[in-house]
């Protein structure tokens, strides 16, 4: 479609109304490239996508898409053989994450029938191995240590060397305190230095890196740390080299999939654009129109999207109707009506919703032409009439039966009699060529043309004679009146003068009376139509309310089932808690032996069911299935605390995972799902089995690192029981340093336990304050 009509109708401003609802740069780019098409299948597809997205929002009103940046240039660089930097990898990582989130959303979607949208969701790719590779880059733009073994080794050495430098400098701060201007370690030229008083500069051997402005302070790098600093500099160079190697290696792994990733990004943007259209529908009460096969247009309560508080109007352009001629005075809204028709058609043929009521229909036109406004050229010295006529001549040479033509103030700018005759001749030519046309004019002669000519219809814009203001209501089938006499009379002109004027045009009175009757009939019809629409709106509200109630009832059923399970679990927990209290009371009041108390406690636990049998509960089954690991899931390797991605499951049930550049084989118990870590509220109690270890007598170890407080205390209780049953003399409890909450809980527990003889922190080489050694009474 020609660009001039899009500029005339300000289509770019209309597209900008959708931008606030977009979440991705891909969607924004597709919106900006959006243009009307005459291909019916493309328009139908866009309409179907919007309707399906509306249905999706009914079930998932908070459906959203992760924001993504444009990656077309990144993928192009990959295809050309370039290696990517960290920032570019993060862009790809975000796209892959968004793709996976959308796939997961689609897999769990229920109660919605999708056809067009399903094609897009199902075309998204899953790259579990690439996702594992890209875990090497964290969101802060840092390459993780687990990206490669060599990088981890280098960074460990850097850390050790830096620790040595700090230790040496701290010792020197204490030893040379009287020689320093300040008791701090400074940094100069990337080196750690001491601020030495100038009078003592020869007392501390080392390299001078700087002198203060006053000359009183000399910044010296002590000789003891020079060699270490050089080692660190060398290691930093090795680190940079290894990071470049990692970037090159991952670039090579991603390169074969560049086109697929770019396609995924386009699909994400397309889904985002469809989502934005539906958000616009919700915000502006817009609709997806029906598509007419025969250029029939029926717009119900249509509004101009760029006009604030626009008056809604009905427009019906039947199959046989070739022209609608809007007559009447200026400033009544004729031009806005013209633009509303054209812009609504452009929006619909671009696959966008329109501001109208349900039941509206649009046609398909190969081209839309318009001559609107004063486009005269000062440089060409053209008059208003010449400017319009030049444009119209050009249009008449291009239009055909598949075009829509909009003409504003046809024949204006010249002698009224000649202008009216020319306007009628142009309209007649268009009628004979069966070209749909909407034209505005203030020539009264065209009223008769509209009445007498087949397939041509008059129309006007309503004017309120009581307030002397236009109402901007479109009155199809009713020719316009100037209302000059009524206006003059209300403004105070003498009735004698008005009477003389009306007598001079008595021959037109019959026509005016007919027009007045038509206006009254149109107003009556409009009132009836408004009443019908009110009833329809009430019905729609009731239908939505019933649907909402139905969905709420279903959700309440699921909630009740979950609540029943929680209540059952609470009862079990209460019973176990009461049994613990009973046993504590027995222990305090009697001389029962420890193993007898533990055996009694175990028997009580057996009385309580481990879980409530809700195997037939579909909601719980779905939740359980959702927690099960699957290919593509992000995981945390428990032994390393590093993130990775599951790439495949082996026949023996174990999983292969990509952790940075390292591929690992893991059992399910050796990793945890990232999503499960974030979402699970209740974890099944895990009991660490006490094992005897070789060495100095019987020993046992419990690792509580990474546990929640309640979980850690439960495991500690069970662990101590088992240690006593196995007659252990001593056990180790690893709780880490962290925030100190679990360490404090362990201390309080051991203080209360009467079977504990003593406890204390482990030696520095065995964990220090991160571990506690417990000795039991004999």
Curated annotation (Swiss-Prot):
Task: Report the coiled-coil segments.
Answer: none
Keyword Cell membrane in record: no
Question: Which GO molecular-function terms appear in the entry?
Answer: ATP binding; ATP hydrolysis activity; ATP-dependent DNA damage sensor activity; endonuclease activity; mismatched DNA binding; ribosomal large subunit binding; rRNA binding
Disulfide bond entries: none
Q: Which domain of life is it from?
A: Bacteria
Q: What does this protein do?
A: Endonuclease that is involved in the suppression of homologous recombination and thus may have a key role in the control of bacterial genetic diversity. Acts as a ribosome collision sensor, splitting the ribosome into its 2 subunits. Detects stalled/collided 70S ribosomes which it binds and splits by an ATP-hydrolysis driven conformational change. Acts upstream of the ribosome quality control system (RQC), a ribosome-associated complex that mediates the extraction of incompletely synthesized nascent chains from stalled ribosomes and their subsequent degradation. Probably generates substrates for RQC.
| Family the entry assigns | Belongs to the DNA mismatch repair MutS family. MutS2 subfamily.
Query: Per its UniProt record, what PANTHER family does this chain match?
Result: OS10G0509000 PROTEIN-RELATED (PTHR48466), SMR DOMAIN-CONTAINING PROTEIN (PTHR48466:SF1)
Official protein name in the record: Endonuclease MutS2
The species is Streptococcus pneumoniae (strain JJA)
The organism's taxonomic lineage, starting at the top: Bacteria, Bacillati, Bacillota, Bacilli, Lactobacillales
